[in-house]
């Protein structure tokens, strides 16, 4: 290999890798398979870089569409973009959701104690973007209660503040009542399930 190429590669090894470039240079790894338990004496899984990589991929998917934002209900997509996770029954009740806008700083709505937890233990999130919220729990709370209408109004306000009120919103998974409320408030909804799977 020419000296110039070696020098360039050497400089890249010691610099911070760009978010969208996978770290797959196995030939130069001292440890082929890094352990998952963090220790002070080795760099193992770089979770900071993992979070940046995931969000960058999701942003790349968003920017490839005409959408002003992605509204995410699939809890794996919520984890992928916000790096937050709540186990148990909350996963399939459609009560957690995230909004990824073109500024790259996602919003997350969660039940109250979880929203507080994210503010304490997820410093990569803007604290003002971790919201307490509740929707319909897959029909257990009737739409007439007004929680869905309030949530859509809040989302519409955030889009207006970002200058995106006329842009379509991509949704990966949605309850009918939420979809109908978005349409009633004049929001154009498009399917971005495959876009997020590609991210």
What are these regions (language model features)?
Residues 1-199:
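A composition/biophysics-driven feature that prefers long, compositionally simple stretches
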């Amino acid at each position: 290999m020419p000296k110039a190429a070696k020098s360039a590669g050497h400089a890249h090894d010691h610099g911070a890798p760009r978010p969208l470039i996978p770290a797959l240079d196995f030939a130069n790894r001292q440890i082929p398979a890094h352990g998952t338990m963090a220790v002070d004496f080795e760099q193992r899984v770089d979770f900071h870089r993992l979070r940046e990589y995931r969000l960058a991929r999701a942003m790349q998917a968003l920017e490839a569409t005409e959408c002003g934002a992605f509204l995410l209900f699939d809890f794996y997509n919520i984890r992928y973009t916000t790096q937050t996770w709540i186990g148990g029954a909350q996963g399939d009740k459609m009560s957690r959701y995230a909004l990824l806008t073109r500024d790259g700083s996602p919003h997350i709505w969660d039940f109250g104690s979880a929203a507080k937890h994210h503010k304490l233990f997820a410093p990569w999130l803007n604290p003002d973007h971790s919201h307490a919220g509740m929707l319909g729990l897959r029909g257990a709370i009737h739409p007439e209660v007004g929680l869905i209408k309030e949530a859509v109004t809040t989302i519409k306000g955030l889009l207006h503040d970002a200058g995106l009120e006329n842009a379509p919103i991509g949704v990966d998974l949605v309850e009918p009542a939420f979809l109908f409320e978005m349409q009633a408030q004049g929001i154009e909804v498009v399917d971005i399930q495959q876009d997020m799977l590609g991210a």
